[in-house]
C-alpha cells in the first residue's frame, strides 16, 4: 500500500461524508500505527502507535528524534518481542540481522511525529531522490502536486541526470 495523501482523504470525506481511519503496517507486522477507535483523525497522518508496539523515531545515529524532526520509524524489541512482528526472514540470516539491529526492528520508513503524538509518513529510506546534493522525498512532491485541482493522480520518480545525478520526474493524470 501507499500512504494516504491528505487531499485524497479530504475528497473522500467531502464526497461521501465518511472519515477514513488510516493505518500503517508492513508485511512483517500487524498494524503498527493507526487511527484507532474514536480518536480524532488528522487527514494525512498515519495515526498514533498501537499499544502493543514500542515505537520510536530515530536519527541516523539511533537517537530518538524530537517532535517535528524526521527520522526512521523503528520498533524497540530489546525488552520484549511483540506479538504480530515477524521473527525473521526465511532462510536469510543476513537480511534478518540487518532488520533487527541493536535491539530495534528497522522499518526503513521515514516519518515524523507532531506535538499531539500523530505520526506522518515522509518516505522510504531507499526511495529518496538525490538531486544536486538535495534529498527529495517523492511522497512529499506528490502531496503538493495532489493539491492542485487539475491533478487526479500522480507519481514522482527519480531519473538519471548528468549534471544533478537525478532529476525529479512527475507523471500526472489530469482531472
Locate the predicted segments by residue:
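AMP-binding/adenylate-forming catalytic core of the ANL superfamily
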Residues: 25, 77, 81, 95, ...
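Residue-level recognition of short loop/turn positions
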Residues: 59-61, 70, 115-116, 150
Amino acid at each position: 500500500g501507499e500512504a494516504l495523501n491528505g487531499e485524497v482523504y479530504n475528497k473522500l470525506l467531502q464526497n461521501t461524508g465518511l472519515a477514513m481511519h488510516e493505518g500503517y503496517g508492513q508485511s512483517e507486522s500487524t498494524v503498527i500505527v493507526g487511527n484507532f477507535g474514536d480518536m480524532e483523525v488528522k487527514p494525512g497522518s498515519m495515526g498514533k502507535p498501537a499499544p502493543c508496539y514500542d515505537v520510536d523515531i530515530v536519527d541516523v545515529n539511533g537517537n530518538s528524534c524530537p517532535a517535528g524532526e524526521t527520522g526512521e520509524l523503528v520498533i524497540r524489541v530489546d525488552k520484549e518481542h511483540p506479538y504480530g512482528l515477524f521473527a525473521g526472514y526465511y532462510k536469510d540470516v543476513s537480511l534478518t540481522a540487518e532488520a533487527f539491529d541493536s535491539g530495534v526492528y528497522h522499518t526503513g520508513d521515514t516519518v515524523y511525529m507532531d506535538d499531539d503524538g500523530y505520526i506522518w509518513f515522509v518516505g522510504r529510506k531507499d526511495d529518496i531522490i538525490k538531486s544536486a546534493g538535495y534529498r527529495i522525498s517523492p511522497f512529499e512532491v506528490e502531496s503538493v502536486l495532489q493539491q492542485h485541482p487539475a491533478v487526479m493522480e500522480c507519481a514522482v520518480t527519480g531519473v538519471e541526470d548528468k549534471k544533478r545525478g537525478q532529476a525529479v520526474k512527475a507523471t500526472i493524470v489530469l482531472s
